[in-house]
Swiss-Prot record:
It comes from Pseudomonas aeruginosa (strain ATCC 15692 / DSM 22644 / CIP 104116 / JCM 14847 / LMG 12228 / 1C / PRS 101 / PAO1). One of its GO terms (molecular function) is aspartate 1-decarboxylase activity. This is Aspartate 1-decarboxylase. The keyword Coiled coil does not apply. Is synthesized initially as an inactive proenzyme, which is activated by self-cleavage at a specific serine bond to produce a beta-subunit with a hydroxyl group at its C-terminus and an alpha-subunit with a pyruvoyl group at its N-terminus. One of its GO terms (cellular component) is cytosol. It catalyses: L-aspartate + H(+) = beta-alanine + CO2.
Length: 126
């Protein structure tokens, strides 16, 4: 059996660019791609915290250290500069891989400053 699991997440990143007339994709600071394990051209899901939009695109590399999140092409209709987004990548894992799987999560502070990283989401309490 295989399961689709969260592979990586950038939590509360701010959109820095929304470029309608650009080949579709989402440009992400190359340092964050490396740290999260998201690969260039990998399918990603983007969840817009500010307007509720959810959409699929693929990641491309932005300049290392740029703090860039650029939503491009038709997806630029779904996010504007300043919107806070969650960017997720998922992968298929075998039963054997599930035993040791831990997602890589990057948590962003205002201004796209990396706050911290984690491999687990805290248990939600009432």
């Amino acid at each position: 059996m295989h399961a689709i699991m969260l592979k990586a997440k950038l939590h509360r990143a701010e959109v820095t660019h929304a470029v309608l007339d650009y080949e579709g994709s989402c440009a992400i600071d190359g340092d964050w791609l490396d740290l999260s394990g998201i690969r260039e051209y990998e399918q990603i899901q983007i969840y817009n915290i500010d307007n509720g939009e959810r959409f699929t695109t693929y990641a491309i590399r932005a300049e290392n250290g740029s703090k860039m999140i650029s939503v491009n092409g038709a997806a630029a209709h779904k996010a504007k500069v300043g919107d806070r987004v969650i960017i997720c990548a998922y992968a298929h894992y075998s039963e054997a891989e599930l035993a040791s799987h831990k997602p890589r999560m990057l948590y962003m502070a205002p201004g796209n400053q990396l706050s911290h990283t984690s491999e687990a989401i805290p248990i939600q309490v009432a």
